[in-house]
Design a protein with these regions (language model features):
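Secondary-structure capping and boundary motifs in well-ordered enzyme cores
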Residues: 34-42, 142-147, 155-162, 287-295, ...
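C-terminal, well-folded lobe of enzymatic/effector domains
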Residues: 310-333, 337, 469-514
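Betabetaalpha-Me/HNH-type nuclease active-site subdomain
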Residues: 1-32, 356-482, 486, 496-500, ...
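Short helix-capping/linker segments at secondary-structure and domain boundaries
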Residues: 56-60, 174-176, 304-313, 401-411
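Short, charged/polar micro-motifs that form catalytic or ligand-binding hotspots
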Residues: 31-43, 152-157, 169, 173, ...
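Glycine- and hydrophobic-rich flexible loops that cap the catalytic core of alpha/beta enzyme folds
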Residues: 1-235, 469-470, 474-475, 482, ...
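A cross-family structural signal marking well-folded subdomains
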Residues: 151, 179-402
C-alpha cells in the first residue's frame, strides 16, 4: 500500500524499545549493541524480508551484485561471525542459518512456538518477494521502500532493571501477550528490585529456568495457560473450589515472590508443574479421561509428590483413571460435576501431604455416587458413537489390552500408534454398515470396532461376512474377535450385536469397578 501511494508517502511501523548494552567495533566503525525489549517481531520480520530479497538478487547484473554485497554486509558482520539481529530462542539455528546460508526448513518441522514463528515468517517473506516480482515490480524498488519509507521510533533504556517494568507497562496496552510471559517479566523485575543479592547469578538462573519452561511447552500454547493456572491453584493459601483463572494466578504467584528464594522457588515450581502437566496430557492413551481440567489437576498433583514412589503412584493413578472415566466418560457428566472435590483433593495431596491410603480413599469417595452399575447401564443399548468417539477409542484400547492378557499374548502397540495419530472417526468401524443397519442397532457398542486408519472407509458398506477376513488381517484382537463372532453365528445381526455388547459390558463392569 505504501508503494502504491507514491514516493512521497511513508509508513510508521512501530515504536521499538531497546536496552543499550555495550559498544562493539567492527573494523573502524563502532556500533551500539542493543537488546530489543519491545518490537522484536517487527524487526525480525523486516530482517527476514531483507534476506529473502538478497536471495533473489543475481551476481551477473552489476547493479544487483552491488546490492547483494551491501545486503550481505548489513545482515552478517565480521566474516560470517556476527548477525545484525540475534534471537533468544534460536537453539535450532533456524534464524541464523537462514541469514548465513539462505537455508530454511518447512514450518511443520518446528518443535516450539518460537521456531514455528521464525519458519512461518521465512515462508511468508519468500512468498511475498515472489509475488512482488510476479506483479512486475522490481527488487530494487522493494529494497528502496524498506530502506527509505518505513519508519520506527526508537526508545532507549540504559538499565536492565527497567526492562521488566517497561515490558509490563507495554503489556497493559491491550496487546495479546500471554499471562505466562507477563509473570516472567514480573518475576524478573522483582529480582532486579531486590537489594544486596548476586543479581547476575540470580538472573542467569532464572533465565535458565524459563528457557526450560518454554522448551517443555513447545508448540502447545494451551499448556502454558494450564501450567500457570495449576501452579497457582496448588500454591493457594487455602484449598480452592475451582482452578484459578490466568490473571488471578499471576496475582497469586506475584504476591509470594518477595525474596530471591521465593522468586526462584516460584519459577522452579512452575517448571515442575509444567513438566507434570506435559506428562499427563502427552499420554494420548488416556485423553478421554484428561479432557476434564480438574481431573488433569488431580493427576498432576499426584505426579508432583516426590515422596510417593512409582509402586505407589501407579495404583493411585489407576484409581484416578477408573473413577474419572466412570464420571466423565461412561456417564458423560460435564466439567461442572465434582469440580470442587477434585480441586480440593489436588490441593490437599500437595499441601497436606496426604498419605497414599488417604488419597486412594478420597478418590473412591469422589466416585462413590457414580457406581459401575449406573455406568454400565448408561452404555447398554445406547448410542456409543455420536459424541462418544474419543471415549469409545479409549474403551476399545483397554479392551484390546484385556484380550491380550486373556490370551497370554504380548500387547502390540504398533497398530494403536497409528490409531492414536488420527481422529477417532478415521478408525471407528460400524460392523453392520451405518447405511444398512437398523436405527436401533446402528450405533450400539456391540456394532462398533476400531480398525487401522482409513480401513473403515475402504470397507464401507460391505457385508459383515465379507469384512471378516480384513478384520482378521489387521492383527487387532478386537477386530479378530468380531471376525470370530461372524464366523460362529449366522453372519451379523441383532443377536450377535447384543451378545458382543454384553460380553464387553461384563468386562467393563469389572475393569472400572472399585
Amino acid at each position: 500500500k505504501t508503494h502504491e501511494k507514491g514516493s512521497d508517502e511513508g509508513h510508521f511501523m512501530a515504536a521499538v524499545v531497546c536496552l543499550r548494552r555495550t559498544k562493539q567495533r567492527i573494523n573502524t566503525d563502532e556500533f551500539d549493541v542493543m537488546e530489543v525489549v519491545d518490537g522484536q517481531q517487527r524487526l525480525t520480520t523486516l530482517i527476514i524480508l531483507l534476506n529473502a530479497i538478497k536471495l533473489k538478487f543475481g551476481e551477473k547484473d552489476k547493479g544487483e551484485a552491488k546490492l547483494l554485497r551491501e545486503l550481505g554486509e548489513l545482515l552478517v558482520k565480521e566474516g560470517d561471525e556476527l548477525l545484525l539481529l540475534q534471537t533468544n530462542h534460536d537453539a535450532t539455528h533456524y534464524f541464523s542459518d537462514f541469514l548465513r546460508k539462505g537455508t530454511s526448513q518447512p514450518s511443520k518441522k518446528a518443535k516450539t512456538l518460537a521456531d514455528r514463528e521464525i519458519l512461518e515468517a521465512v515462508e511468508d517473506c519468500k512468498a511475498f518477494v515472489t509475488r512482488w516480482m510476479s506483479d512486475g515490480k522490481t527488487l530494487p524498488d522493494l529494497l528502496s521502500l524498506l530502506k527509505n519509507r518505513l519508519f520506527f521510533l526508537l526508545h532507549e533504556i540504559d538499565s536492565e532493571k527497567a526492562v521488566y517494568t517497561v515490558f509490563e507497562v507495554l503489556n497493559n496496552r491491550g496487546l495479546d501477550v500471554s499471562w505466562l510471559d507477563r509473570l516472567k517479566s514480573i518475576l524478573m523485575g522483582a529480582a532486579f528490585e531486590l537489594k544486596n543479592i548476586n543479581h547476575a547469578g540470580t538472573i542467569t538462573e532464572l533465565h535458565n529456568i524459563w528457557r526450560d519452561v518454554y522448551s517443555v511447552i513447545g508448540l502447545r500454547q494451551g499448556l502454558s495457560t494450564e501450567a500457570l493456572r495449576f501452579a497457582a491453584t496448588l500454591r493457594a493459601v487455602e484449598a480452592p473450589s475451582r482452578p484459578l483463572g490466568e490473571e488471578a494466578s499471576v496475582d497469586a504467584l506475584r504476591s509470594v515472590a518477595t525474596t530471591v528464594k521465593s522468586i526462584r522457588d516460584t519459577a522452579s515450581r512452575l517448571l515442575r508443574v509444567t513438566e507434570a502437566c506435559d506428562a499427563v496430557t502427552a499420554n494420548v492413551r488416556i485423553n478421554s479421561v484428561t479432557r476434564i481440567s480438574q481431573a488433569r489437576l488431580l493427576a498432576t498433583a499426584i505426579s508432583l509428590r516426590g515422596d510417593i514412589d512409582e509402586t505407589q503412584r501407579k495404583p493411585l493413578l489407576a484409581r484416578w483413571e477408573k473413577v474419572s472415566f466412570r464420571i466423565y466418560g461412561m456417564l458423560l457428566n460435564d466439567a461442572r460435576t465434582r469440580v470442587g472435590d477434585y480441586v480440593r483433593l489436588a490441593w490437599q495431596v500437595l499441601n497436606e501431604k496426604l498419605p497414599v491410603k488417604s488419597i486412594d480413599a478420597a478418590i473412591r469417595e469422589i466416585g462413590s455416587e457414580f457406581t459401575i452399575e449406573r455406568a454400565v447401564d448408561a452404555l447398554r443399548n445406547a448410542n456409543c458413537y455420536e459424541g462418544w468417539e474419543t471415549e469409545l477409542r479409549y474403551f476399545m484400547f483397554r479392551y484390546e489390552e484385556h484380550l491380550a492378557k486373556q490370551q497370554k499374548l504380548n500387547f502390540s502397540n504398533e497398530q494403536w500408534e497409528k490409531i492414536w495419530m488420527v481422529s477417532p472417526s478415521e478408525s471407528i468401524e460400524h460392523v453392520w454398515a451405518k447405511s444398512r443397519a437398523p436405527v436401533k442397532q446402528r450405533h450400539r457398542l456391540g456394532n462398533l470396532v476400531l480398525l487401522p486408519p482409513k480401513l473403515n472407509s475402504k470397507l464401507q458398506d460391505d457385508d459383515p461376512k465379507d469384512k471378516a477376513e480384513a478384520y482378521r488381517k489387521t492383527g487387532l484382537l478386537i477386530a479378530g474377535e468380531v471376525a470370530d463372532f461372524i464366523k460362529a453365528g449366522n453372519g451379523w445381526n441383532k443377536t450377535a450385536i447384543e451378545s458382543r455388547e454384553e460380553a464387553m459390558l461384563d468386562w467393563a463392569a469389572r475393569e472400572w469397578a472399585d
